[in-house]
Amino acid sequence: MDSEPSAIFQCLTGADETNYHQMADSISRIFLTASGGPFAKRKAALSTVTPQEALQHPRWKMGKKITIDSATLMNKGFESIEIMNLFNLPEKKVQIVIHPQSIIHSAVEYQDGSIWAQMGAPDMRLPIQYAITYPEKKPSPVQKLNLFEVAKLEFMEPDFERFPCLALAFEAARAGGLYPAALSAADEVAVDAFLKEQIKFTDIPKVIYTVLKKTPSFTGKVNLAQAAQADEQAHELALAVLQDKSYKKAII
C-alpha cells in the first residue's frame, strides 16, 4: 500500500502483468524516489537540528517516528531493503533519487534504456485505493494532478555523507543476515532518544553504526524467530550504547 512499492508494482505489471516477479534480468535500475525530507536543501549544519524542525515534513503528515526517519533518509533506506526483497532485486539495481515535488512515486528503467514512471498527486489515498480495487482503477476523491501547475520536476542525487543513515541501510542490505533487523531496532531507539532531546540529530546514525558493528554476522536465510531475537538484542544493545555513550566515538 505504500506509494513507492505500489508505483514500482504498477510499472512492472504494465510491462508484464503475469511475470512481473521474475523480471529482475530485464530491469536495469529501480529509481526509488524520496522527497528528501525537511533538510533536502538545507545548507546549515544538521548537528543543530531540533526535534521540532525535523518533524516539519514538507509533503506528508505522518507519525513522529517515520517523520524523523524521513528527515534522516533512513525511511528510504528501509524502503530500499523492502524493494530488494519484494521484487527480488540486488542492491546495485536500486537507486535513490531525491524528488522534492513527490509527483513521480518511483520508476523502472529497463535494459533497453526506456523508463516507466508512475505519477500522481502526493496523496496516500491513491495507493491504498489501488491495493483495495486491484486490478481495477476506480474513480478517486483525490484531486487530479495538473501538470501545468506542477510546471517542473526536480531530481537530485542523495548525499550519503550528509545523510549517513541511508548509507548504513544499504550496508545492512548488502550484509544481509541479521543486520536489517538490527538496523531497524537501533534506529527505533536512536530516534526515540532524539525526540526526547537526549542526543543530537547527527548522533542518530552514530548510535546505529555502533550497534551494527557489534551485531554478529550470520550466513543463510533468517527466519522470523531469528529476526525477532536480533531485533530484541539490538534494541538492548542500543540502549546500552546510549547509556555508556560509546556512540560518541563512532566515525562514519
Question: What is each of the regions a protein language model found here?
Answer:
Residues 1-252:
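Catalytic, metal-anchored helix/loop core of enzyme active sites in primary metabolism
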